[in-house]
Every structure is written in structure tokens, then in C-alpha cells.
């Protein structure tokens, strides 16, 4: 790491320690993500290196740039563009109120980043407010894109914090192993509701069972009628027939009817029925975004 001066530790990410650093040559501030691998004896898997090389090609204003990959001994250090805060910290600064224009701008940027990455056949698989970063001029950027495929999604973070289930779709909670872009669209829906409610999570489940119950109590329990092949999923088990008791206008009171319509198109239990990022960007909710 001869080219970088470490300034301070920013935190513990899902995959390892993150430092704020300065590029000695250019003076630019960057984020260094040091990836810890489960089996250090093995070194860095070639599959991980292949995936990471793909990520270097992702260049979009709503995706955090991966500038460089430094591979030494058993360590892999990823050099990313630096952002001041994540969406979770941004929520903390709001005092419980998010104005409609800011909410729409954040969601628009999230979907633009997703659309770009999905067009390049890269999934995120672990979207949450902690890996949506915001820089000083209010641009939202998706971080950690593709790392789940390169390194797997661990059950626990490097810091022993449990990886959250709050943004996982029902198909994944039921053990689905074949992912497509729909996994990210569900997460985007959960984040959309959280943005609208100024940081209050939509489905804050304690474990897989509680997570599924919370989802089905709001959306209604799925069945073979509205989700063919649900019973074939590896960890499927039947749940009671839940009927929603709260309306969407009660759950996201700050979201207008167009926003609620988009939210319901994102939060479809059957992955085949979920709206994709491009269609979401064409939704009427974004029709009046000349101000964004």
C-alpha cells in the first residue's frame, strides 16, 4: 500500500476493515477496503479476482468507483472512491422527517445505479442503507456491488455483527439459490419505504421466521396460486393465512399514491412478478422530477 497514507479507520464492513486514506500522488481521498478471507491459507480465490476485475469496469455516477485492486500475500485491498456518509447516517440527521422531493431524488438515483449494474449483469444481493453512500453534493452511490458474488454473503460481518435479513426477499429467505435482478428490486422496495419514513425500517425481523411473518402480515400469505413453485423452494414451509390489516397509506403516510403504487410493484413476494429497474424508472412516480 505504498501509494496511500491511511488517515483513520472508518468502520468494519461486511468483508473487513475500511480505512479513509489519501493517495500520495494525487492527494485524492479514497476508501481502502481490506478484505479478510475465511481461509487465509488459500490466498485470494481466482474467482474472486475475476469478479473484482469486472467491477472495475462499472463507471456510473450512482455507483461507487473501484479505482484499484491491490493484491498482496493473502490480503486483498480494494481502493474505492470516498463518500462522506451512508444512508443510515443520513437518516439519523433527519429528526424523523424526510421531504418528498429528497425521497424521490434518492430513490431515482438508487434505481439508476441498479439499472446500470443490472444491464452489465452484476447483482448486488446485499443492498441496505449501510451500503448506499451519499457524497457532499447529495449524490447517492451504491457501494459493495458485486462483492457478494466474489466473496459470498457471510452469515456474520467481519465485526461479528449479524448480516441483516431486513432487506432479503421471501424467495431468498425460503432458500432460493438461483438469483436474478429481482433480489435487488425487493431490497430497493424495502429501502424506498424506509426512505419515505425517514429511516424507520419496513420489515425489521429478528430471524428468518419472524422476517417472513412480518412480510406476509403486510402483503398477505403467498400460495401456489399467486406464486407457482413456491413449495419447491429448499426451505419452504407453510405459514398461516395472513390478511393485511394496515393500508399502504398508513404504512408510508408521506408517500403519494404514485409512490405507493411503485412500492407495491417492488414488494411482490413472487420474484417473477417484481418490477425491474428500467420499468421502475419509467413509473409515473418519477414523471415530475425536473427538479431532481
Curated annotation (Swiss-Prot):
Q: Which residues form the Protein kinase domain?
A: 4-286
Q: What is the effect of changing residue 144 to N?
A: Loss of activity. Decrease in glr-1 synaptic localization. Loss of polarized trafficking of dense-core vesicles in DB motor neurons
Give its E.C. classification number.
2.7.11.1
What is one Gene Ontology biological process annotated in the Swiss-Prot or TrEMBL record?
Answer: axonogenesis
SUPFAM superfamilies hit by this protein: Protein kinase-like (PK-like)
Please report any disulfide bonds recorded for this protein chain, giving both cysteine positions.
Answer: none
Q: Where in the cell is it found?
A: Cytoplasm; Cell projection, Dendrite
Q: What class of enzyme is it?
A: transferase
Q: Where does Mg(2+) bind?
A: 131, 144
**What keyword terms does UniProt attach to this protein?**
ATP-binding, Cell cycle, Cell division, Cell projection, Cytoplasm, Kinase, Magnesium, Metal-binding, Neurogenesis, Nucleotide-binding, Serine/threonine-protein kinase, Transferase
Active site residues per record:
126
Q: Which InterPro entries match?
A: CDK, Kinase-like_dom_sf, Prot_kinase_dom, Protein_kinase_ATP_BS, Ser/Thr_kinase_AS
Mind telling me what this protein is named? Cyclin-dependent-like kinase 5
- The gene name reads cdk-5
